[in-house]
Amino acid sequence: VPTILVASDAPTVRAEIAATAGNPETTIVEARSGPEVMTLVAESMPALVVVDMQMGNMGGMATTLELHLEASYDKLGHVPVLMLLDRRPDVFLARRSGAEGWLVKPLDPIRLRRAVTALLGGGTYYDESYAPLSVVAAPLASGA
């Protein structure tokens, strides 16, 4: 039974993820901060960490970087990270952090389920639900 660690300082975000990602085949564990994520990963080594970008004094990017750093020194095993982003420009930060996947809020249950399934299966998931500005601007510039 895979364990999914859900990290956010917002109870509503944790509840939404748990309701969507949880099922009889998974165990959901919740964290409210980056340091709590680090402790729980060291104790239980979840199959996936879902982390909110905006979270207390150690947000999603810092937490993801720390998880990857610890894994690179063999202090922790590698655990995939799905990062929840507040805005489209945060994709740059998610890429830089090495997150294996990300979703831009507001969360869509179907995309969240797809992302969790992909990462639990050893894959990646990059939210393509938003259109880059160059794609949006091109039809406007051509008069279309």
Model-identified regions with their sequence ranges:
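Acidic, metal-coordinating helix/loop segments flanking the phosphotransfer/catalytic sites
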Residues: 32-48
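His-Asp phosphorelay/catalytic-motif detector in bacterial-type signaling
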Residues: 45-47, 72-80
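Conserved acidic segment of CheY-like receiver
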Residues: 1-21, 49
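Alpha4 helix (beta4-alpha4-beta5 surface) of REC/receiver domains from two-component response regulators
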Residues: 62, 83-103
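Alpha-helical interaction/dimerization surfaces of two-component signaling modules
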Residues: 19-21, 40, 93
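Conserved phosphotransfer microenvironments
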Residues: 47, 51-69
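CheY-like receiver
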Residues: 123-144
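C-terminal output helix
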Residues: 107-117
